[in-house]
Amino acid sequence: MASINLIKSLKLYKEKIWSFDFSQGILATGSTDRKIKLVSVKDDDFTLIDVLDETAHKKAIRSVAWRPHTSLLAAGSFDSTVSIWAKEESADRTFEMDLLAIIEGHENEVKGVAWSNDGYYLATCSRDKSVWIWETDESGEEYECISVLQEHSQDVKHVIWHPSEALLASSSYDDTVRIWKDYDDDWECVAVLNGHEGTVWSSDFDKTEGVFRLCSGSDDSTVRVWKYMGDDEDDQQEWVCEAILPDVHKRQVYNVAWGFNGLIASVGADGVLAVYEEVDGEWKVFAKRALCHGVYEINVVKWLELNGKTILATGGDDGIVNFWSLEKAA
């Protein structure tokens, strides 16, 4: 089994870290204290470079997401709004971001935000049981709601787009993952993934080109892998639970991340970071580490690509971001 080794630990907040996202060398983080902090991640250098205006939101920052290949950031808050931030062009090359827009529409806390691969759709989800899809242009200044999806029966915890297709997955307190697709400008639910026996906190798509698989993490302490099998005559998609990953977690699984390297990482209430590898069609534990944030729960995990190296980042209730390397056993 490989080892998981701590590279760097950054104490960013006094309260819990809910979410972060990485793009173009910058890790954006969101916390209960309403602040969004940006960390420059380069080689072995991890530096806090900006703290965004905390007056933009009245409550916790629950989710942050970079628009692909840009310096535009979306942040969803418990105050039911979404803020959009853009990098300010400065002569002295300092990194600063300005508030570009506030998006309103949800009736309750926004739990998740996610950009489509082309950057023209922004999906948001909420405690109000709905998923909203917003359309924007290249500037990212104006947002039009083109669809409100209300088929979940409970709080929607998380949204994620397929890495190359206009396919959206939403995870919910109703124990399901729903798959959404655009048919002639009409977004429809094309599949309901049933199997988890508790809240589904998050999901992530396989990054392999041309492949349609999804992993999900739940209150039932399991991580599952789902596979798309095809469409039926009514254009509904058939997804099957291809695997339940080895039993590592003893409590809720809050976040999962499927890396470009094919590995799946999971974290949760038990403080364990687990990494799984598929070998000849069977999933095995590649590495695991307990107490990654001491006695605190872990809310988020991400794969980071740095100059040809792949590392992991985790964020917990302790307000700390930890960066980890994976070392294969000799």
UniProtKB/Swiss-Prot annotation:
User: Its GO biological process terms?
Assistant: iron-sulfur cluster assembly
- WD repeat feature ranges: 12-49, 56-95, 105-144, 151-190, 195-236, 248-286, 292-330
Query: Is the Repeat keyword given for this protein?
Result: yes
What the entry lists under CDD domains is as follows: WD40
Subcellular location per UniProt equals:
Cytoplasm; Nucleus
What does the similarity note say? Belongs to the WD repeat CIA1 family.
Return the protein name: Probable cytosolic iron-sulfur protein assembly protein 1
Q: What is the lineage of its organism?
A: Eukaryota, Fungi, Dikarya, Ascomycota, Saccharomycotina
